Amino acid sequence: MSARTSLHLAAEIGGPPHYDAGHYLRLAGLAEDGALDYVTLGDSFARPGLDALAVLARVAPATDRIGLVPTVTTTHTEPFHVSSAVATLDWVSRGRAGWQADVSTTEAEARLFGRRPAAPPAAPPAALWQEAGEVADVSGRLWDSWEDDAEIRDAATGRFIDRDKLHYVDFEGSTFTVKGPAIVPRPPQGRPVTVIDATTAPAREAAARHADVVHIRATTPEQAAAVRDEVRRKAAGHGRDPEALRVLVALTVDLGDVETAPEPGLESGPQLAGRGTYFRGGPVDLADLIAQWHRSGAADGFHLTPITPERDLERIVNGTVALLQHRSLFRTFHPGGTLREHLGLVRPASRYAAARTAAKEA
């Protein structure tokens, strides 16, 4: 299958707080055994728990292929620090990092920091997502601010870097400015993968501008296709290649007592549940749904959130994924080593290197 038609699968490994690294290592290893594209680990300042990015930095050396995508809220964090942390994760994972941008909307979260109030009730979430988009924008610029060959490590002359290949970004956003350059060399992927959960309209706009992967909510293939087309149309309007955007349906799954008939109303497929969609059934039912939706061209794949990670992820990998592999609908191994390669996304060149080359040739 081509990169555009390949089925992409990802899974959330968060849930009730765990403070044992082994828990996350086991789940990430299971997802890797199933050749999933990536795992996500949700995070929020609104609830107690470990820092998702730090946890996945611990998981990185214990895994070889699986992509690692922590949630990073942009509302109360410094963009320069976000960029550095995600770049570091890409280095320690040897090119398997992504990050899922999110926003913090509550007064309780704002009080934890004491630096600024939460958005007043009259202010739309669009302001927070505009800021999140600007963080994604400046992060990409900071990752580009070191050209790939900026490190020369010339012991004879004592030069560690070629200063001509480091660049100021001079970014001015609505709530912050960043001069740059980065303090972390350009990541292995060039730019780690940016993921946005576009289940709200403001988030969808940010996703169209900045995301490599978009998670959407849908209860039918037709609805998924409509949302996917909307996001791609918006991306094209911002001068992006819409075919380079991967759109995954976000689905919460309960593969519990599969011997019991589905609850009333859950027999025909996903149902709305809060900000996401909910599916209850068996591993075979889930495989059938994924196959049907993907064959219809409704989406590029699915991001699955197990209700009970220890139980349901095992059933996803050894049941649903194994069946999809048997049907030749999903790969049996990772063909590449980076998350971008899993997703069929090219490694972008540094915008500053391209500009410098163009200036030389002018």
Question: Predicted regions span which residues?
Answer:
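Active-site mouth loops of central-metabolism enzymes
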Residues: 12-22, 71-80, 103, 116-122, ...
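N-terminal beta1-alpha1-beta2 module of alpha/beta enzyme domains
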Residues: 1-62, 189-192, 337, 355-361
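Long hydrophobic segments that form regular secondary structure
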Residues: 175, 182-243
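Hydrophobic faces of well-ordered beta-strands that scaffold small-molecule active sites
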Residues: 5-11, 39-41, 66-72, 95-101, ...
